[in-house]
């Protein structure tokens, strides 16, 4: 699909959390690089920079996600980074500074966004009868969002 879209001059974007990236699998990497050759922009969620904390939050390591960001940057593909801000979970100042350091090391980042956690989809979980994984989470205040934007150096990347 991306190949056809790009052939017609259509801008293509991949919005991903990066979890399936497998840099040690040559077949996967070849297919991924073919996709990237037809991708105008990648929007990547970085939930947590610390591998152990990421594992606690998601059940998965983040090494492949960070490797994906680096690989995309090395390929020269424009990159937007998003960070969902959940008070008490993803707002630790030291880890946000480390995230900013990592982002700064990437060559093609055009934009960094802080996405404030919200409960707009909570009704879907309730309707399906599925326990909501963040029952005690609350949206961040405007001040918390502003502080995260400062720590992540959002203004460096006007996108």
Task: Cite the ranges covered by each PLM segment.
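A structural motif corresponding to the C-terminal lobe/cap of the Radical SAM core domain
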Residues: 101-104, 110, 126-152
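Radical SAM enzyme core and accessory elements
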Residues: 154-159
């Amino acid at each position: 699909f991306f190949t056809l879209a790009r052939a017609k001059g259509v801008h293509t974007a991949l919005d991903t959390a990066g979890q399936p990236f497998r840099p040690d699998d040559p077949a996967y990497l070849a297919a991924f690089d073919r996709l990237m050759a037809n991708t105008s922009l990648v929007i990547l969620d970085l939930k947590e920079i610390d591998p152990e904390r990421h594992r606690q939050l998601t059940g998965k390591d983040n090494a492949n996600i960070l490797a994906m960001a680096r690989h995309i940057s090395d390929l020269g593909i424009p990159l937007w980074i998003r960070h969902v801000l959940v008070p008490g979970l993803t707002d630790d100042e030291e880890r946000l500074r480390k995230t900013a350091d990592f982002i700064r090391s990437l060559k093609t980042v055009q934009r960094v966004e802080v996405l404030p956690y919200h409960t707009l989809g909570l009704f879907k979980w309730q309707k399906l009868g599925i326990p909501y994984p963040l029952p005690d989470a609350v949206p961040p205040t405007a001040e918390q969002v502003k502080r995260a934007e400062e720590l992540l150096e959002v203004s460096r990347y006007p996108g």
